[in-house]
Amino acid sequence: MQQQPSGQQSAPTSPYAPVDQSGVTLDGLDIGEVVAEIHSQGYAVVEEFVGAEVIEPIREAFNTEVPITEMRFLGSTTGNTWRAHNLLAKTRAIDELLLDPRLRAIVEGVIGKYHQINIATLFNTLPGEFKQDLHQDDGLWPIPRPHPSFLCNLLIAFDD
């Protein structure tokens, strides 16, 4: 038990619990607000999170270093979505993005400080592709709902 200033005791906090990011601001981004939005609606949109100085080297690496393949499996039959898996094994261009302190703080606010990158994938969705409905990517794990968050996805749109 932890001792509170008033003398009351509270239950110990799990080291795996999400980090309270209330009032935390990094580089002008209110981390607590973003995390609260994720907890409230399941996602948050952060406009202009990444600037051109980060995007351009990644785009260049995707055009020169990373083999991209057509994705006719995994739900797409049009041939209008191309995909590259295991980006961390293929390029160092995304390191800066994945180590961004704002991103790490958001993830810690959602799933806790003990997290790891499991998958880094590129999607190139071309004109004519069917829209994909919002969905949760935790279906691979047969855990009954509701359950604590154990997955936090990031999607960065390079183009409008």
Name each model-derived stretch.
Residues P144-D160:
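Short, conserved beta-strand element in jelly-roll/cupin
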Residues Q2-Q41, V46-P146:
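Non-heme Fe(II)-dependent double-stranded beta-helix
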